């Protein structure tokens, strides 16, 4: 499985919480225009939209910021994923990651568990579970 996407997020809260748990909630939307699923029957090409990602960014560290995230969305593919099921699937995921902050831009690295399932749209619904390493490049915009 391989994918490329873009994310836009909004910080929802001011920092709060005690000690090392101090952080803030972020809501994000992912658009994944390139989603490849390599299967025994061939490669399925798809598009993903994840309108729900809720993330807790820890705010105590300054240059390396850990986070965890829960999210979900929809995956549309040109072939059945898994084979014999559906062209439309739903995704749910959880991730642990780090933002490496610089003055203007940042890098991110995360480990993500993702479940892909058609939620009963087809009579066959075996689902796929994946563990992914994701790398990202971005910019945090600050509003004043």
Identify the function of each model-found stretch:
Residues 1-51:
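Glycine- and aromatic-enriched membrane insertion/assembly motifs of diderm outer-membrane
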Residues 1-4, 43-50, 64, 86-92, ...:
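Residues that define the transmembrane beta-barrel architecture of outer-membrane proteins
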Residues 6, 52-54, 68, 94-96, ...:
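Membrane-embedded beta-strands of outer-membrane beta-barrel proteins
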Residues 12-25, 59-65, 101-107, 142-144:
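Short loop/turn motifs that connect adjacent beta-strands in outer-membrane beta-barrel proteins
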Residues 23-31, 66-72, 107-111, 131-135:
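Transmembrane beta-strands of outer-membrane beta-barrel proteins
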Residues 31-37, 72-78, 100, 113-117, ...:
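Transmembrane beta-strands of outer-membrane beta-barrel pores
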Residues 39-41, 78-84, 119-125:
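Extracellular loop and loop/strand-boundary signature of outer-membrane beta-barrel proteins
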Residues 128-144:
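Outer-membrane beta-barrel "beta-signal"
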């Amino acid at each position: 499985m391989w994918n490329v996407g873009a994310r836009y997020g909004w910080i929802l809260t001011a920092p709060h919480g005690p000690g090392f748990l101090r952080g803030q909630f972020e809501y994000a939307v992912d658009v994944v225009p390139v989603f490849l699923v390599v299967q025994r029957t061939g490669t399925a090409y798809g598009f993903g939209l994840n309108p729900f990602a809720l993330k807790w960014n820890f705010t105590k560290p300054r240059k390396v910021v850990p986070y965890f995230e829960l999210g979900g969305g929809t995956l549309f593919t040109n072939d059945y994923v898994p084979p014999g099921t559906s062209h439309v699937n739903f995704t749910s995921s959880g991730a642990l990651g780090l933002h490496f902050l610089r003055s203007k831009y940042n890098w991110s690295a995360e480990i993500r568990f993702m479940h892909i399932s058609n939620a009963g749209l087809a009579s066959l619904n075996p689902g796929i579970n994946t563990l992914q390493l994701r790398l990202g490049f971005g910019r945090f915009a600050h509003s004043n």
